[in-house]
Amino acid sequence: MAKQYDVLFRLLLIGDSGVGKTCLLCRFTDNEFHSSHISTIGVDFKMKTIEVDGIKVRIQIWDTAGQERYQTITKQYYRRAQGIFLVYDISSERSYQHIMKWVSDVDEYAPEGVQKILIGNKADEEQKRQVGREQGQQLAKEYGMDFYETSACTNLNIKESFTRLTELVLQAHRKELDGLRTCASNELALAELEEDEGKTEGPANSSKTCWC
């Protein structure tokens, strides 16, 4: 039976509550948009498989709660992330200003070399804009990140931003991937990366199993 994917990566969505992280996740994984969502409690995740540079990548995308009371829980998930989206709402100057705090959390809790992309979400709400595109571009430049303005409502730059972060993670792990490619006798092949510790972590949804 052919493998369904070659490698599994964990991506993380972080940012203030209400910036649209869950909407981004649902649009990318299910191509669905709901104008109202109950705030995420702790963490949740969804999966999607895409192909990048001939490699089938299984993406496990974790959606973290932005409320302060959940920070102790959500920070535990930083350490196993290969890629992180830092999300703000273009109609909320406050959420933009808080990106500096989120970057500080990433620097403290995420592994060295984790790949990052800055997202200015809700680009469809132009009439409510409080943060200019140039501000987002400048902040991303300061932190050495790629930048996208997105809209889960209109599907603007959703596939592009998720694909780009996956590409960055693949590039960062190129040596491991190339090494695993040469191990033709290894049944796990590229998927070995997901089982480096051989144990599960407890997600918010107990019916799902995480092997990364």
Swiss-Prot record:
Taxonomic superkingdom: Eukaryota
GO CC field: cilium; cytoplasm; endosome membrane; perinuclear region of cytoplasm; plasma membrane; presynapse
Organ and tissue specificity: Expressed predominantly in neural tissues.
Enzyme nomenclature, EC number: 3.6.5.2
Intervals of motif Switch 1: 31-45
CDD domains: Rab15
Lipid linkage positions (S-geranylgeranyl cysteine): C210, C212
Binding-site residues, Mg(2+): T22, T40, D63
Enzyme class: hydrolase
GO annotation, biological process: exocytosis; neurotransmitter secretion; positive regulation of regulated secretory pathway; protein transport; Rab protein signal transduction; receptor-mediated endocytosis
Co-factor requirement: Mg(2+)
Function text: The small GTPases Rab are key regulators of intracellular membrane trafficking, from the formation of transport vesicles to their fusion with membranes. Rabs cycle between an inactive GDP-bound form and an active GTP-bound form that is able to recruit to membranes different sets of downstream effectors directly responsible for vesicle formation, movement, tethering and fusion. RAB15 may act in concert with RAB3A in regulating aspects of synaptic vesicle membrane flow within the nerve terminal.
Similarity-based family: Belongs to the small GTPase superfamily. Rab family.
Protein name: Ras-related protein Rab-15
Species lineage: Eukaryota, Metazoa, Chordata, Craniata, Vertebrata
